[in-house]
Amino acid sequence: MTVERPPESSVEPAQPGGPGVPRPIVAGVVGGVSVIVIALSAWLALRPGAEKAQTGLVHWFNDPPQPFAALFAVANPFLRPVPLAVVAIVLMGWVLLTRPGSAHRLAVMRAFVATFLLAQLMTQVLKHVANQPRPIHVIPDLDTHGYPTSPHGNAYPSAHTAVVVAAVCALWPWMRWPQRVAGLVFAALTACNRIYIGAHWPIDVVGGIAIGLLSGAITWLIAARWPIQETR
């Protein structure tokens, strides 16, 4: 007499922390690489002649050829401080509306707030460490393209880039593919815009991207270690 075994479920066990939250090893690799990039980019930013080496690329972004000129000009009004914050909040709201269950929504909000605070903290600390002037204070006749105020503080790293990349990275596990595409476009345009208006050097943007990825990776670890359970 043979005993039939119950069929095995074809459904894979859910990842801890929510749908698609990367495993701790993945978050650790992303975070580790980001730390290396931050250290290397900060070192390069402080090297003698760093501004001169990047001047040509700054000129290209400040007065780019078509179709980049048209693309940057259209995106520019939406990437100023207030519109940028609105776009980021709208992106988070879009993700919230498409995630079922209060636990997922709470996880999204926790990730968004945590990554914002982490990115801001890291950028402000590094701005006090890296004493690098902004391109508009070094290169004459740069076009700010209507930026409402003169950027304050040191150039390295780009806080705007760091925060936007951090938000997209942190929310990535809960995003559907259209939201991921929109997030990547948003982050790429923000990074390019910071050079376009003369507020940052390319190395500042590289540092900002790395800080954003590190902040996002930390929120992945938080989501995996302390998942928010659905209440009944």
Locate predicted features.
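N-terminal transmembrane-helix/juxtamembrane module of multi-pass inner/ER membrane proteins
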Residues: 2-87, 127-148
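Interfacial segments of alpha-helical transmembrane regions
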Residues: 24-33, 90-122
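Hydrophobic alpha-helical transmembrane segments
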Residues: 76-99, 163-164, 168
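Aromatic-anchored segments of alpha-helical transmembrane domains
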Residues: 37-41, 117-124, 185-199
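Membrane-embedded catalytic cores of phosphoryl/pyrophosphoryl-handling enzymes
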Residues: 94, 140-232
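Transmembrane helix-loop junctions in multipass membrane proteins, especially transporters and channels
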Residues: 46-50, 99-103, 128-136, 198-203, ...
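Transmembrane alpha-helical segments of multi-pass membrane transport proteins and ion-pumping complexes
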Residues: 120-124, 128, 213-220
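Membrane-helix interface segments
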Residues: 67-68, 102-108, 136, 175-181
